[in-house]
Amino acid sequence: MTKEIAFKKMPFLLMAVCAAVLVGCDEEEAPAPKQPQAAAVVEESGEECLQRAIDKLSGEGKDIEAADAAAKKALELMPDSAEARLVDGQAAYMKKEYKRASADFDAVVAEKSLPAALRAEALVSRAVVEIAQNEFDTARLTLFRALHLDHRNAAAWYHLGLLSRNTYQFDEAAVEQFEMAARLSAPGDPRTMKLSREVIPAIRASLAAAAASRPGAAKRDAGAAAKLIAEAEALRKKRQIRAAMKKYEAALAADPFSYPAARELAYLVSLNDKSADGVDKALRAYRVAIDLRPVVQDNYYAAAQLAYANKRWATAVSILDRAIAHDPENHKTLDLYIAALQKAGRDKHLNAWKAYRQELK
């Protein structure tokens, strides 16, 4: 799951010696009958139970049942300990007791007096539970909440990267998220090394291959496109908008990687052709612009706004889903996303998104 909470090792040596004396003596060395009977075991403290649970959850001596018992005991002895509740949640997760795990993590998140980083850890753990139950949309939002509390939480970035790559196919966002995870993790960590050496290069190679296979990519003519764009700009100044639109369209055909051609074509068509075919053409051009510059939020917003205005609610939601992957705290994007969710009848997560939006104020 998430990185383990570090606790200082307790001084077990003296306790172990005492226990050996109490339970290891011979019959002849036993106390006289009239003397009080010595205890057979030494009661562990809450901190010791907690450390034992952590030890049993990881490492060579991993034992989930023993960890679970120790975690429950630690929580019983320290019911107000956020750390004990987090470890109990981890043990519950390992046993696939997801309801109990979620309750533990939610309790930590709800305690607003706790450090933001600790609450973020609980949210990441909560998201992992949700992923295990295939609640991917819920998990993504939970991870956004974690990053709002602690932008340097490497585990949150890592799990977002997994969701972007494996569930949503937002590969550009996955690269950004995995890079953040690698940057914030220990350099020698095996997962960090795998991200940097294998995962990120593989996604980049896939993106490059997809770009190379784009229609017209092999015969692109950037020079011709630049000339056509200049002609389009001259026509716009003369208010010959229809002619300018044709020039931008020709420029994009000459060079499918021309971001200015895609962006300006989308903008002009959306303003000047209100027919269904015009909306389709504008949305296609916006998608090209988005593919070429996936971090530019304005293109997502303009495309989604166009879809929303034409009652294409599901299209607006789809566009904004991708926008949010790159910038989950953009207020304007979120407001339109929530409105589109409501219009599309996507009520399952609507209240959760509204609550998240309130957290950002």
Predicted features and spans:
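Bacterial signal peptide processing site
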Residues: 25-28
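Alpha-helical segment of the N-proximal tetratricopeptide repeat
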Residues: 42-73, 77, 94, 223-246, ...
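Helix-start (N-cap) detector for alpha-helical repeat units in TPR-like alpha-solenoids
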Residues: 45-47, 82-83, 116-120, 154-155, ...
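Structural signature of tandem alpha-helical TPR/SEL1-like repeats
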Residues: 61-70, 95-107, 133-142, 168-177, ...
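Structural marker of alpha-solenoid helical repeat scaffolds
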Residues: 77, 111-115, 149, 184, ...
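Canonical tetratricopeptide repeat
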Residues: 87, 121, 125, 159, ...
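TPR/TPR-like (Sel1-like) alpha-helical repeat modules
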Residues: 165, 170-189, 321-361
